[in-house]
């Protein structure tokens, strides 16, 4: 079957006319993980109350939302590895957001790249969905906003940003932190703060840049880490280099969760200091503890080609 589109599929009128990628709450599925329950069962907004965690009157665990990017899913191995690393590190409630139906990559896998603009058009709606779940956590389960952190890759980074904007509109306050893993560049590079992930979307917004084409070189957060100058990651071959570099952001962050050594961010300048001379007042470790370091701004991060990727044994003096 041949599907042909005439006009701009990013236009809301065109999307409505063709129903390319219709959004509803049922197009977003969730996996809830804790140390006690690691089953990758899918839940919807209507069925989430069946999970043991939501049979409680109060949820005391810190909450981490993980949102995948275009053409991916919550069960993709890199996100499963991230969730496992988080559960090993702390007693979290992890909410893995699966929005592949809203990106049309589930129904039309062979044509998935045709639907990028349609997926972009649904990012704010998926963000609003996450905000709705956050509202439920705060109001029904007494989870403080300071206990909620969002992690998103590529389009998932912008989805997380839109969720951060929406909870503020709902007068819930700000999320503790949003971590954008190589936020998608196409359709977002020139957008102002209201139309992309932005430093005002949470109390602390951490951005990892790993691909200059699929991602963006633009500063977006409280801290922006330009890993290997933000492009051409070591160990990524030329032919699939951009996709590999784009995905490396997820792998880097997972290693930062999993291991004691950190990826060290050195303040960007014409003559950046070597990581061997980094101090806690000048440099920042990428990862869950980044906001404990006082420095803000843009940082250069040297990495190795293989895991655990850290340079200088990941030590700050």
UniProtKB/Swiss-Prot annotation:
| Coiled-coil residues | none
Q: Which residues are glycosylated?
A: 25, 229
Q: Quote the catalytic activity from the record.
A: a 1,2-diacyl-sn-glycero-3-phosphocholine + H2O = a 2-acyl-sn-glycero-3-phosphocholine + a fatty acid + H(+)
Q: Which cysteines are joined by disulfide bonds?
A: 21-104, 193-198, 236-244, 261-285, 262-310, 278-283
| Tissue expr | Expressed by the venom gland.
* A GO molecular-function descriptor: phospholipase A1 activity
Q: Which UniProt keywords apply?
A: Allergen, Disulfide bond, Glycoprotein, Hydrolase, Lipid degradation, Lipid metabolism, Secreted, Signal
One term under GO cellular component = extracellular space
Against Pfam families, the record matches this protein to: Lipase (PF00151)
One GO biological process this protein is involved in is: lipid catabolic process
Superkingdom as given in the UniProt entry: Eukaryota
Point out the signal peptide segment.
Answer: 1-7
Read off the SUPFAM superfamilies from this record. alpha/beta-Hydrolases (SSF53474)
- EC number of the protein: 3.1.1.32
Q: Where is the active site?
A: 154, 182, 246
| Propeptide residues, chain positions | 8-17
Q: What does this protein do?
A: Catalyzes the hydrolysis of phosphatidylcholine with phospholipase A1 activity. May act as an allergen and induce hemolytic activity.
**Family membership noted in the UniProt record:** Belongs to the AB hydrolase superfamily. Lipase family.
| Protein name, UniProt field | Phospholipase A1 1
Organism this protein belongs to = Dolichovespula maculata (Bald-faced hornet)
Lineage start: Eukaryota, Metazoa, Ecdysozoa, Arthropoda, Hexapoda
